[in-house]
Amino acid sequence: MADIACFVERYTVSRAEELTALVNFKLAAHELGHRLEYVFRKDIGKITDYDALFIRSLTDPLNAAYVAARTAELHGMKVIDDPDSIIICCDKINMYMHLMRARVPIPDTRFIGKSELDRQAMVQLFEE
């Protein structure tokens, strides 16, 4: 049996769909013989009391979910939405490069820089 922390931001529980998902995660954990507790931002210091961490909030290297994931990883815990994945997925160009290297089929993609953000360039882009 594992003690699992589920990191949740309060804003993520304001939608009925999210609440349903959180309840379903807890039920699934119990059915598999595990204990799942919800952990909020104020509880980040308690994350190391658990065996594993599951992130169920918006992830970005600049928010609390990343701090929670990094804390758990540094303490050798299993983490779903680990810090490296958060960084890769938040950086779309980095993610694109990983997909290309792995030969994952993806739609034609073009990156545009700040200097290309004018009306004429956008019209031309969509006419190609």
Each model region followed by its residue ranges:
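A short, charged/proline- and glycine-enriched loop
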Residues: 1-3, 48-49
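Short, charged N-terminal beta->alpha structural module
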Residues: 2-31
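Active-site nucleotide/adenylate-binding loops and adjacent lid/helix of ATP-dependent enzymes
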Residues: 4-8, 74-76, 84-128
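Residues at alpha-helix caps and immediate loop-helix transition turns in enzyme cores, especially N-
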Residues: 17-21, 64-65, 91-92
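Short amphipathic alpha-helical segments and helix-helix/interface helices
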Residues: 22-26, 65-70, 96, 122-123
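Alpha-helical structural signal in soluble globular domains
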Residues: 28-32, 71, 98, 102
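N-terminal glycine-rich "phosphate-gripper" loop used for MgATP/nucleotide binding
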Residues: 34-74, 80-90
